[in-house]
Amino acid sequence: MLFLEEKKIIDKENVIGSNIRRIRLEKGIGQTELIRDLQLRKIAITRETLVKIEGGRQHIKLDQLRAIRDILQVSYEDLLQ
């Protein structure tokens, strides 16, 4: 179940993080490359934060999700289901 809380998406089952990792790997994009692309879009994120998001130990922010969706060229549905 997903909740939007103060521009953070609460994903108790880590659906989003797992999907980000799966899609990123399917597209051959490394964590460092994704972080670089996010930072070029002025998204404040570190590799450590991405590792935590993918591992379900940190909630993703709405602006991070939006930018990751654009970089990976997928729909919100691909990330949320």
Where do the model's predicted regions map?
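Short, conserved catalytic or interaction motifs in soluble domains
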Residues: 55
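Short alpha-helical DNA-recognition segment
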Residues: 28-52
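A short, Lys/Arg-rich alpha-helix, primarily the initiator
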Residues: 1-27
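Helix-turn-helix DNA-binding elements, focusing on the entry/boundary residues of the two helices
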Residues: 20, 31, 47, 62-65
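DNA major-groove recognition helix of helix-turn-helix/homeodomain DNA-binding modules
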Residues: 61-78
